């Protein structure tokens, strides 16, 4: 869908069935840098899901493209070729009969197409490495991930965060699901904790989570530093005076081609470098006993 936003505040895309039942309601609110998602069933709005944007790709007077991809489990939404969020099906998608678009936009085109991948590779617009630190952030690795690699990330946690994540994954696509040898997910709501996991070791699903308490330096509103150390058979994540539990690798790191960062973090620095195995080897060795 190609559209141009007029000088106003919001617009709506609805996927409808029956007598004005809304299986998926997408409502970008430009004045709030916020995109609402919901359903409207039997005359009642469901629980709203929201997505806040530090820098919105939807700007007054500027053209843009939205893609809504229907997967087995959810609607996947990208803007200008960049995946933004998903919305789990509350109504079987095959019930949808029509699309409704209205609000403060100048609609240029709308189409229904079939695709085997999402986002569509022909419209993916990842910047070259280091051109931008805006989230969602993709880094296309130019060589295989090897023991001795260190990933340095610096930024500031948003004041009212829900979560942010860092994936070391096999492809740039959201669908089909990439292999993810390492997944770091920092969660703030409804509970605060850190998850380390992988996707694809036990089949087409998430594997067993390793949970740990949230480091104080990753508290809402604080500047944070994330250092990820790659070893032969495990990964170690640490800050200035703490470390997460060692994550034993379940999948071959040779499959990692991209680093993906998304969520409630304003990133200010990203770098891949190497490290010498010194005192952090001692920490890992102690945990692995």
Predicted features by range, described:
Residues 1-65, 69, 73-78, 82-225, ...:
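Peripheral membrane interaction modules
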């Amino acid at each position: 869908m190609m559209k141009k936003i007029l000088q106003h505040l919001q617009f709506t895309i609805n996927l409808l069935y029956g007598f004005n039942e809304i299986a998926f309601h997408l409502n970008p609110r430009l004045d709030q840098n916020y995109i609402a998602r919901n359903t409207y069933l039997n005359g009642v709005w469901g629980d709203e899901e929201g997505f806040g944007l530090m820098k919105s790709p939807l700007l007054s007077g500027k053209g843009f493209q939205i893609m809504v991809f229907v997967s087995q489990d959810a609607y996947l939404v990208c803007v200008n070729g960049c995946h933004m969020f998903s919305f789990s099906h509350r109504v079987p998608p095959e019930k949808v009969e029509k699309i409704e678009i209205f609000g403060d936009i100048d609609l240029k085109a709308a189409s229904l197409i079939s695709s085997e991948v999402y986002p569509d590779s022909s419209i993916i617009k990842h910047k070259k490495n280091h051109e931008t630190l805006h989230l969602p952030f993709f880094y296309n690795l130019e060589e295989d991930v090897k023991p001795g690699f260190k990933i340095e990330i610096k930024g500031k946690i948003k004041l009212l965060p829900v979560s942010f994540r860092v994936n070391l994954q096999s492809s740039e696509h959201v669908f089909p699901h990439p292999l993810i040898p390492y997944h770091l997910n920092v969660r703030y709501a409804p509970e605060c904790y850190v998850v380390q996991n992988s996707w694809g070791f036990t089949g087409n699903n998430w594997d067993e989570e390793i949970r740990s308490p949230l480091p104080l330096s990753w508290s809402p509103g604080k500047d944070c530093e994330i250092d990820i150390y790659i070893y032969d058979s495990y990964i170690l994540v640490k800050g200035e005076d703490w470390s997460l539990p060692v994550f034993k690798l379940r999948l071959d790191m040779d499959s990692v081609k991209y680093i993906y960062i998304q969520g409630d973090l304003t990133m200010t620095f990203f770098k891949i470098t190497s490290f010498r195995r010194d005192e952090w080897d001692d920490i890992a060795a102690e945990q692995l006993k």
